[in-house]
Amino acid sequence: MLRTIIRHVPRLAGLVLGCALVAGVAPTPTDAATPFKMDLYFGAGYERQIDARTCTAASTAMTLNFIARKDLGLSQMDILRYEQPRDALNDAKQRGSDPLGWSKALTYFASRTGTNFTYMWEAHTSEYAALKRAAKQIAVTGRPVGLVTLNGGHAVVMTGFEASRDPRQGDFKLTYLWISDPIASSHKRYTAAGSPLDKYLELDATPTYDKAWYGKYVMVVPQGSTPNRVGTVVVNR
């Protein structure tokens, strides 16, 4: 079960992914050889989770704030109540939600931004390839990406990145990323090698999702016009 956990602090109950959305103004495309930076964070859009259950809900709320470029006033508890019946967790044990419920909430509440779009979970076998995928989707869609951290116990939002070139112009080297965490830093820069994304090691969902997520790098990603309705597992070589 995804649950918000802070190191050196008593374990917080419940599964709660936390996305912190980082918003900014999307830059105009530049020359392929020019270093590229994009960050969607803005301070008024950030939300801190209201309790141990609501990091996925807080993440959803702030993600949508960053997309809308304003505080939408979404209720974290309303979001959580939407997520839980639609996620893959054991209902007798869960208190928060998981990547499936989180992605469904982002898609359902998208209309509050004034438009419609789809988020889906993705499970990658390579951390660096996963982060490059996240950076490219931020550049292509102008929307943040959710990262599952603490081995499936928490989640944050990747709001931006720095790279050797614009991902829309071809292959690139990812150098830095910007993260918003609903229970920690509202906006923090990490090296690509030092990102908080790590392997999902929880076994509290249905067998199908346990198999899909376990041992992989799991993200909640804004999709293009043809999303995979059941998510996707990507083998990165």
Model-derived regions, located:
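Conserved active-site-adjacent core of cysteine acyl-enzyme catalytic domains
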Residues: 82-236
